[in-house]
Amino acid sequence: EVKLVESGGGLVQPGGSLRLSCATSGFTFSDFYMEWVRQPPGKRLEWIAASRNKANDYTTEYSASVKGRFIVSRDTSQSILYLQMNALRAEDTAIYYCARDYYGSSYWYFDVWGAGTTVTVSS
């Protein structure tokens, strides 16, 4: 069974930091692109970061809203995806999800999602 389990959310003051984790199992972690997506209260899902697969040297990509503040990384020995979040702002308040990125029939889609972890940025 393919599983993604996020952890590390919580309440943090503006300017603070958090590190989210996404423990994965049931598939070959190094073969897949992995993504972080968030959903602020009352808003749509927002893609924020990607970690490409081993074939693409685990290179990363970020949305403009988090670039320079957030860092996505992997522990390939434990099959864990991380999101280091720095200089947090009130607008970073959201449920954060990790997702597996799958290629099929000439298009990409996120085929497996975790249940999410909640981050609240407030003083």
Swiss-Prot record:
GO terms for molecular function: antigen binding. InterPro entries: Ig-like_dom, Ig-like_dom_sf, Ig-like_fold, Ig_sub, Ig_V-set, IgHV. One of its GO terms (biological process) is immunoglobulin mediated immune response. The keyword Acetylation does not apply. It comes from the Eukaryota. Residues 1-114 form the Ig-like domain. Keywords: Adaptive immunity, Hybridoma, Immunity, Immunoglobulin. One of its GO terms (cellular component) is extracellular region. All those sequence appears to be identical. This is Ig heavy chain V regions TEPC 15/S107/HPCM1/HPCM2/HPCM3.
